[in-house]
A protein has these predicted regions:
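N-terminal glycine-/serine-/threonine-rich phosphate-binding loop
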Residues: 2-71, 145
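Ligand-binding beta-strand-loop-alpha-helix segment within the catalytic cores
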Residues: 19-35, 95-167
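Short glycine-rich or small-residue beta-strand-to-loop segments that form or flank ligand, phosphate
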Residues: 70-74, 103
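Glycine-rich beta-strand-to-loop/alpha-helix junction loops that act as flexible
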Residues: 73-78, 170-172
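Active-site catalytic pocket residues across diverse enzymes, especially alpha/beta-hydrolases
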Residues: 86-93
Length: 173
């Protein structure tokens, strides 16, 4: 089975006007029937930059009001470009993650090694920004089966306690 096929999609046969409208009218014509707003970019890098820019804007808005920005993150390869751009913004544009709370969306179960989703996110993202480790919540892939239901209920309560999720980044894979 081939993987990472989404990075090989090219838009050479699709006229630009179908994915990059020139004005608000064209945009409304293209999106009026969408139930979920969708943007199409020519490359994964372009899409990653746009998503990271949107996340950074929302983080900064919450910082201005002294509030916490809550996001849920996946593992895998899909978000790596977004993480790379957020790290760049942290290093070059002083984007701070001190007011950010993260909920890791899932974890392997049973976790039989230290190479779970949380470990990968830590290596690929958390270790490169100034997020407080106490603000990172992750499912525990090593708990007993009897404890899973209670843990999941507590995880939901933790999400509610911080006001819900502001931004959820999902993987495609």
């Amino acid at each position: 089975m081939k993987t990472n096929l989404s990075s090989q999609i090219t838009l050479m046969r699709i006229p630009t006007r179908y994915y990059r409208p020139e004005n608000a009218f064209e945009h409304s014509v293209l999106t009026r029937l969408e139930k979920v707003p969708t943007s199409i970019y020519e490359s994964m890098d372009d899409g990653s930059f746009a998503v990271a820019k949107e996340i950074a804007t929302q983080i900064r808005k919450k910082q201005e009001t002294g509030k916490t920005f809550v996001m849920a993150l996946p593992g895998g390869r899909t978000p790596l470009g977004v993480f790379k751009e957020l790290i760049r913004m942290h290093e070059e544009e002083q984007l701070s993650f001190r007011n950010v709370v993260v909920f890791v969306e899932y974890e392997f179960y049973p976790l039989d090694s230290a190479s779970g989703i949380y470990s990968r996110l830590k290596e690929e993202f958390f270790d490169h920004v100034d997020i407080d480790p106490a603000n990172i919540y992750s499912p525990d892939g090593s708990m007993s089966k009897d404890a899973i239901l209670d843990f999941c209920q507590q995880y939901e309560q933790n999400i509610q306690a911080v006001g819900g999720i502001d931004y959820m980044l999902l993987g495609i894979g």
